[in-house]
């Protein structure tokens, strides 16, 4: 008789479900066609609702890959690496994490799954990701986090760039952008 192989702690099928990139893009396209004024908020809410399960998957993955109980136990260098590898392995795309100013992180990706390759959109379109990342990073920080996408491949930008910070910080940045500043000027970087 043989002993069953040990089961790894991180099992994506126990924490998350997979959906194809085309399904995600079609969902956004259908919502834009049928419910245009509500697309961003609807997808952000859905992403935020899914954040807890993705965070639990990240916890299990970090335990297995890095030997820590919580992602927050990793120093900044390893946390950025862990987040990039984790989202890459789940199929979302690789992220580069960098500090912008004193209170904002930038998450950059040239292959983010939610971004359409067609280009030409007027605004950044990774709404589900914004909600999802806000919940995940809020749980990492053990507080509230907000996420705002400021560059998007769907808009023909080279990359998707998500800003992560405290809600009041991103609200102030958004207000400065509404007055005509670029996001870099609004952050002061």
Describe the residue ranges of each PLM region.
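Active-site helix/loop of acyl-thioester processing domains in fatty-acid/polyketide metabolism
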Residues: 124-142
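N-terminal accessory segment detector
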Residues: 1-105, 111-128, 149-189
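Hydrophobic beta-strand-centered segment that forms part of the acyl-chain substrate-binding groove
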Residues: 141-149
């Amino acid at each position: 008789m043989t002993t069953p192989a040990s089961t790894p702690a991180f099992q994506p099928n126990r924490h998350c479900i997979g959906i194809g990139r085309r399904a995600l893009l079609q969902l956004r396209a259908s919502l834009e066609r049928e419910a245009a004024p509500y697309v961003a908020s609807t997808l952000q809410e859905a992403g935020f609702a899914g954040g807890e399960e993705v965070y639990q998957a990240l916890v299990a993955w970090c335990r297995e890959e890095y030997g820590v109980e919580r992602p927050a136990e990793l120093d900044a260098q390893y946390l950025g690496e862990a987040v990039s590898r984790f989202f890459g392995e789940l199929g979302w795309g690789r992220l580069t994490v960098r500090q912008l100013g004193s209170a904002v992180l930038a998450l950059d990706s040239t292959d983010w799954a939610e971004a359409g390759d067609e280009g030409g959109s007027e605004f950044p379109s990774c709404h589900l990701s914004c909600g999802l990342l806000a919940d995940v990073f809020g749980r990492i920080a053990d507080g509230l986090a907000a996420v705002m996408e400021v560059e998007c491949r769907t808009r023909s930008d080279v990359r998707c760039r998500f800003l992560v910070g405290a809600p009041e910080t991103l609200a102030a940045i958004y207000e400065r952008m509404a007055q005509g500043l670029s996001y870099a000027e609004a952050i002061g970087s």
